[in-house]
């Protein structure tokens, strides 16, 4: 009886050890970007167990085919016996079972994709996004998980996940939490601080020209701004991970952390620093918008296929819109810096021919297959730019019709309160929120500005908040070919030809190399080569295409040497200035000068 009881206890303990899904990663050959992964799955009585590595990672709407880094795959049962397996698609391994058993899989992972923010191993650190390292089974996706790392002694490990008994182990409620909680392990600089009862960490891998004290000061300001939009915070602890490196840039949001990558020498100037802190703000806002509530097409995540949705302009564009507002409200950036940034956004929109072709709905759905480049600029928009401006137009519309009492912030507060994960929201849900908030039907507005290419009247829009979009008085009219070019040795190569512009009408296209205008060699500056001409002039352009010298006639168009700028209207009324303050949370520039 005692022997049977002892065996029963042992069996129970063994089963409990494998009741969770257990992940292990050993950094074995860091100089070659290699690690060894083990995954232990609980007992299953299925005829086969399918295990998968995601094809993409959260926060990046692009198929990355992460399974291409897997080699030496093996599967064993709970007695150590090898199990037969086969690969049935690009990212799925099918393990055949002839009895009920726990399953262990082992494989080598190659991690040298730092810029994709999915996986990287070298002799100084490992960046671990579970999407790029850890396989999962749909059968056990909802089970608790643990992660254990075997890394060099000098390394420190940090994640948004809670520790699981040692400094290199972590635990999560399930695979979805794991995959949205990256781990930074290695030689890093770490700083901790607390604000309003919540804990924060700043972890920096790499050396650069950053000012840690300034970063900490502004991050402390930033994290207080969540209450400007939402009623509460969806976390108790948050981690800012920063890679100061070379050859990588960008950022990704996660549940209660973010990873931000910048060139190591791009922190020092005011412009570079604002780019960094605005990125941190963008990812911080995502803690609510995308992580706490998101469009229904992303709920739940399908890790092996494209997750299409028509509201990515809200997920990303509205986040971009709010980032500039929160930076001003936090006192991180000035009103003048905000107006400068918004000016660039508006001018970029106006110079994008695709804004007249593709709607926010379409660009959201097509994000997964967006190709970028010249064709995209001429025939497409993007979810960040277009979504930001549509959000602004809606915000000012709400404010102006309610005398500053209702705003787009109220819309996102309602989305957070009513559609928290695991629920998603639809376009109809957003329109319902708008209708409930205002008592007005926004269906036609949505049809005109979201489902159709948005035709924003910037002059009328900015007038409501006491601003003007105007060209500087010293701007001069200049001749233009409506194209952009870069210097490639002795010749200028066209990089963008604006649809229906002068160069387009003349038959020029991207990658044409400009040799001469009216038989005179074009130097390194296309604009300088046009200084002696005026709009309407016909010129002969000699160019090389496919190694063949060709010629065309081009009629120069009219342009200006300076773009329009968004400035304060010196004659703004008290009502307009009050609406500006309701919009931005700070005084109108006219009042700020007094």
Annotate each PLM feature.
Residues 1-18:
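Gram-negative bacterial Sec-dependent N-terminal signal peptides
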Residues 19-57:
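Early extracytoplasmic/domain-onset interaction patches
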Residues 22, 34-38, 48-50, 92, ...:
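Intrinsic-disorder/low-complexity, polar/charged segments enriched in Ser/Thr/Lys/Arg/Asp/Glu/Gln
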Residues 28, 40, 63-72, 76-235, ...:
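Non-catalytic architectural context of zinc metalloproteases
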Residues 56, 108-110, 152, 245, ...:
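Solvent-exposed coil/turn segments that connect beta secondary-structure elements
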Residues 155, 230-234, 283-292, 296, ...:
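A generic secondary-structure signal for well-formed alpha-helical elements
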Residues 189-312, 318, 322:
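Juxtacatalytic substrate-recognition/specificity segment
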Residues 323, 332-594:
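C-terminal recognition in membrane/secretory proteostasis and scaffolding
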